C-alpha cells in the first residue's frame, strides 16, 4: 500500500479503538487493541501522517524516535527500596516512570485524554533495548507502567534493505501487531530531464 492508503487504514483503526459504548467504556478494550506497525522506506511520510491523523481526529500525539533513547529512558531509572517479606527486610530494585509514559501523562494533563503514542525506528534499537520494545508491543508497557487507556500505539520501522541496524521481529511479536507494509508512492515523480 502507499502512504495515503496507510494513513486511511490507521485513521480507521484509531477511530475504531476510540469508540465508546453508552456507559463511556471503550468498545474495544486496551487489551484487545493490536498496535499498528508501519514498515516502509525512510522519508515517505510515516511521521507526518501520524501528525495529520492526530489533528484530524482531534486527539493528542506523543512521538519518539526510539533510536535516540537508552533502556533507562524507556523503562525508567532504577532505585533501591526496602520491603518486608515473611518478617524479613529486603532491598529490592524498582524503577521510576518511563520518560515516554510520563510524556503521555503530561499530554493528558494538557487536555488530551486520548491520543497516539508513536514510536519511530522501533526495529533499529540497540541490543539492550530490543527486549523492552518487544515487551512494549506485546504488553503495551514500558517497564512496569502501562500505556494509559485511550492511547493507541503506532510504531514505525524501516525494512532491512534501508538500514543495516534493523532487527527482525519474531513471529510471536508480529502476531500481536497489525503490520502494514508501505511502499514509496511514485505518483508525483518523473524522470529527471537529461541534457
Which ranges hold each PLM region?
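Conserved catalytic/switch belt of AAA+ P-loop NTPases
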Residues: 128-146
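Conserved alpha-helical scaffold flanking the Walker A/P-loop in AAA+ ATPase domains
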Residues: 84-116
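Pre-Walker A (pre-P-loop) alpha-helix and adjacent loop at the N terminus of AAA/AAA+ ATPase modules
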Residues: 2-34
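Walker A/P-loop
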Residues: 32-68
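AAA+/SF3 P-loop NTPase mechanochemical coupling elements
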Residues: 95-96, 105-107, 112, 143-158, ...
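AAA+/P-loop NTPase substrate/partner-engagement loops
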Residues: 59-83
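A short helix-turn-beta junction within AAA+ P-loop NTPase domains corresponding to the substrate/partner-engaging
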Residues: 167-184
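Conserved small/polar residues in nucleotide/adenosyl-binding loops
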Residues: 188-195
Amino acid at each position: 500500500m502507499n502512504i495515503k492508503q496507510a494513513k486511511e487504514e490507521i485513521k480507521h483503526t484509531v477511530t475504531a479503538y476510540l469508540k465508546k459504548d453508552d456507559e463511556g467504556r471503550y468498545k474495544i478494550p486496551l487489551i484487545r487493541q493490536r498496535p499498528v506497525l508501519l514498515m516502509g522506506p525512510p522519508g515517505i511520510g510515516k511521521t507526518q501522517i501520524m501528525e495529520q491523523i492526530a489533528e484530524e481526529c482531534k486527539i493528542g500525539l506523543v512521538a519518539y524516535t526510539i533510536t535516540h533513547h537508552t533502556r533507562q529512558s524507556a523503562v525508567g531509572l532504577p532505585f533501591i527500596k526496602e520491603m518486608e517479606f515473611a518478617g524479613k527486610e529486603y532491598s529490592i530494585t524498582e524503577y521510576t516512570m518511563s520518560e515516554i509514559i510520563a510524556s503521555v501523562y503530561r499530554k493528558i494533563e494538557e487536555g488530551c485524554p486520548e491520543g497516539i503514542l508513536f514510536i519511530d525506528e522501533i526495529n533499529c534499537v540497540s541490543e539492550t533495548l530490543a527486549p523492552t520494545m518487544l515487551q512494549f508491543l506485546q504488553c503495551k508497557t514500558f517497564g512496569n507502567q502501562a500505556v494509559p487507556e485511550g492511547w493507541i500505539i503506532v510504531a514505525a520501522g524501516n525494512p532491512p534493505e534501508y538500514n543495516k541496524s534493523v532487527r527482525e521481529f519474531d513471529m510471536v511479536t508480529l502476531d500481536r501487531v497489525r503490520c502494514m507494509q508501505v511502499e514509496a508512492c511514485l505518483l508525483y515523480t518523473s524522470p529527471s530531464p537529461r541534457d
